Regions:
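Blade/loop signatures of beta-propeller domains
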Residues: 1-7, 35-36, 42, 119, ...
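A short helix->beta-strand "capping" segment at the edge of beta-propeller domains
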Residues: 1-16, 93, 187, 284-285
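Beta-rich, blade/repeat-based domains predominating
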Residues: 14-27, 55-74, 97-118, 122, ...
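A short loop-to-beta-strand structural motif that recurs across blades of beta-propeller domains
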Residues: 38-40, 79-81, 128-131, 172-174, ...
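Short loop/turn segments that connect beta-strands within beta-propeller blades
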Residues: 43-47, 84-88, 133-137, 177-182, ...
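Beta-propeller fold detector
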Residues: 50-54, 90-94, 141-144, 184-191, ...
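Blade-level signature of beta-propeller repeat domains, shared across WD40, Kelch, NHL, RCC1
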Residues: 245-287
Length: 287
């Protein structure tokens, strides 16, 4: 049985265009994207949606810097776009000359401003990779080993590892050590996840982390000792409707949010008893 049922799970806001990604900014706002290019900024207290930019394509994962510039993976345009708070959109990276991005899926910053980006490739194509985009926009491929649809990713709270949700063959969460924008050690399997499609990741202050699963409609929790538990599960697929990404927000990062690619809303649960680990919001400057 789930450790937390859906009693306290609710719709945060609705009327979004199949949101795949969700993130909290340094300004406390909640950010999301739509499948037709929409970029949403949402006031947490007022639950007011502002559509303030358009990337022109299918928006997936996102990350923010210290100035609340948003870095959006726009899959069908093969690029990561930078969106300023004023809504100005510019291309931040499209990969390398030798290996252009095909399906950029999720970005995650480290403290130095390196942006790690998963490029999922095609379903069962075994053609994914992981990039690192330096704060000046210089891009390098740092991993081709983990090629079976690398999906959501997160830098560990201590900045030592990049965790990646591998959606296929087998579904699992992996990690490898990083330093100065480079992969500096071997890949390790953190947990295998048979019969699910892991998508998003979020770290908690107690050393556990959450996994949002595109299939089935479930959010899992990996405890510090490695045990796997179910945090929330929705067999009807209504409150959790293909929950693709998760983040913590609210005044003390104790409110859990999730995006629902299969529906039109963001979900919220303020009673999980968990707090999110602080994210990295680097100062990118004018890069």
């Amino acid at each position: 049985m789930p450790l937390i049922n859906l009693k306290h799970a609710e719709t945060f806001v609705e009327g979004l265009d199949h949101p795949e990604g969700v993130a909290v900014g340094p300004d406390g706002k909640i950010y999301a994207g739509g499948e037709a290019g929409q970029v949403y900024r949402i006031d947490y207290e007022k639950r007011r949606i502002e559509e303030y930019a358009d990337t022109g394509g299918l928006n997936l994962g996102m990350a923010l810097d210290s100035a609340a510039n948003l870095y959006m993976c726009t899959a069908d345009r093969g690029a990561v776009y930078k969106v300023t708070p004023a809504g100005e959109v510019s291309q931040y990276s499209s990969g390398t000359t030798e290996r252009p991005m095909t399906t950029p899926n999720y970005p995650a910053f480290d403290e130095q401003g390196n942006l790690y980006v998963t490029n999922s490739g095609s379903w069962y194509g075994n053609d994914g990779c992981i990039y690192c985009v330096a704060s000046d926009g210089t891009t390098a491929v740092i991993d081709t080993e983990n090629s079976q649809f690398p999906n959501g990713c997160a830098v560990s709270p201590d900045g030592q590892y990049l965790y990646v949700a591998m959606s296929l063959s087998p579904p699992q969460i992996i990690r490898f050590p990083i330093e100065s924008g480079r992969k500096v050690g071997p890949t390790e399997t953190v947990v295998e996840l048979p019969h699910v499609v892991p998508d998003g990741l979020a770290f908690c202050t107690d050393g556990s982390f959450l996994i949002s699963c595109y299939r089935p409609d479930t959010i899992l929790r990996v405890l510090p000792d490695g045990d796997l538990t179910i945090l929330m599960d929705d067999y009807e697929g209504t409150i959790l409707g293909a929950p693709t990404n998760v983040c913590f927000g609210g005044p003390d990062l104790s409110v859990l949010f999730w995006a629902n690619l299969g529906r039109w809303h963001l979900g919220l649960n303020a009673h999980t008893g968990l707090k999110g680990a602080a994210l990295f919001y680097p100062d990118i400057g004018a890069a």
